[in-house]
């Protein structure tokens, strides 16, 4: 899967994207757990997960060929 990082998470990880090889589908929760294990420095950061440009729930599945984006909260006025 391709993972896209934005804003603060992009700055912390010092990369805009990476490819992660999945052998099988994962739930969004499993993906987040994997990400936090790999990058503990983002464990307390808030973000929403979008899969193939659609926001998803933690129980939804991510397939090995999906594009996943970590979208930070948006503030505005």
Swiss-Prot record:
Identify the keywords attached in UniProt to this record, alphabetized: Molybdenum cofactor biosynthesis, Nucleotide-binding, Phosphoprotein
Report which residue ranges the record marks as coiled coil: none
**BP GO annotations:** Mo-molybdopterin cofactor biosynthetic process
**Classification via Gene3D superfamilies:** 3.10.20.30
Q: Which GO terms describe its cellular component?
A: molybdopterin adenylyltransferase complex
What InterPro entries does the annotation carry? Beta-grasp_dom_sf (IPR012675), MOCS2A (IPR044672), Mopterin_synth/thiamin_S_b (IPR016155), ThiS/MoaD-like (IPR003749)
Q: What does this protein do?
A: Involved in sulfur transfer in the conversion of molybdopterin precursor Z to molybdopterin.
Q: Could you describe the subunit structure of this protein? A: Heterotetramer of 2 MoaD subunits and 2 MoaE subunits. Forms a stable heterotetrameric complex of 2 MoaD and 2 MoeB during adenylation of MoaD by MoeB. During catalysis MoaD shuttles between the two heterotetrameric complexes.
This one is known as Molybdopterin synthase sulfur carrier subunit
